[in-house]
Regions:
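Class I S-adenosyl-L-methionine
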Residues: 1-241
Length: 241
């Protein structure tokens, strides 16, 4: 009997994490079905997960370091991570463990053409080598991506590809000094020099003028972006003076 794969996703990568050499997997989804995230719009999603550990429990007990690295929101630190690890990441991982996804083939690049791509819907895109993403980046319409690993040597190849995730103005100064374009998440009352940044056009404070799939400013090579912390995790972002 022929195995029935879930055609909405593919296994993009199986191998070792750049962070600690642990086994990880990267799954791409949205190949059949459009996504409905209000902020991002219709984008292909990529899930960077531990191969053999459920993502929700891995997040709670700190095992997610293999895919999240030094992200300050990794682990059970006040639950400040915006990713709902018990929702889509867990479902994707379960499908993977149940052998529901086929491997990504060269011919599947036709499914990427003209689509918007989100590098790291969960997990940090720099934990795998850029050469894995490159074929997709070469054919997609546009992409977004963010990394908290911008201090790490392995992440330097991603300059011009992803934004450095910055949790303070000091982070911004350091990351931009290394050559990264930045995505700075700040307390709503933290004052900034408006000449340095563009406010995220998809943010609540900017009236959600567009979607990430249309905007594509967060592609690592355009501008430094700032956004007010929002949602249930905003209370964990400190006011800077």
């Amino acid at each position: 009997m022929t195995k029935q794969f879930n055609s909405n996703g593919r296994i993009l990568f199986e191998g070792k994490s750049n962070i600690d050499n642990k086994d990880i997997v990267v799954i791409i989804t949205g190949l059949d079905n459009k996504t409905s995230n209000k902020k991002t719009g219709d984008m292909l999603q990529t899930w960077i997960l531990l191969r053999d550990h459920a993502p929700n429990t891995s997040h709670k007990n700190g095992l997610n370091k293999s895919v999240c690295g030094s992200c300050p929101h990794m682990g059970n630190r006040q639950n400040s991570c915006y990713v709902k690890w018990f929702q889509a990441p867990l479902q994707v991982w379960k499908s993977y463990k149940n052998n529901r996804y086929d491997y990504f083939k060269k011919s599947d690049l036709n499914l990427i053409k003209g689509r918007s791509l989100r590098l790291g819907s969960a997990g940090d895109p720099t934990v795998i080598d850029l050469k894995v993403w490159k074929p997709l980046l070469d054919v997609c319409k546009n992409h977004t991506g963010y990394t908290h690993q911008w201090r790490s040597n392995f992440a330097q190849q991603y300059k011009g590809i992803v934004q450095a995730s910055c949790d303070s103005f000091q982070d911004y100064l350091l990351a931009s000094g290394l050559g990264f374009k930045c995505f700075y998440v700040k307390h709503k009352d933290t004052k900034i020099d408006k000449k340095l940044f563009i406010n995220c056009p998809a943010s609540i404070e900017m009236g959600q003028k567009t979607e990430c799939s249309i905007c594509s400013l967060c592609s690592g090579s355009k501008r430094d972006i700032v956004i007010n912390a929002h949602g249930s995790t905003a209370k964990y972002v400190a006011l800077e003076v």
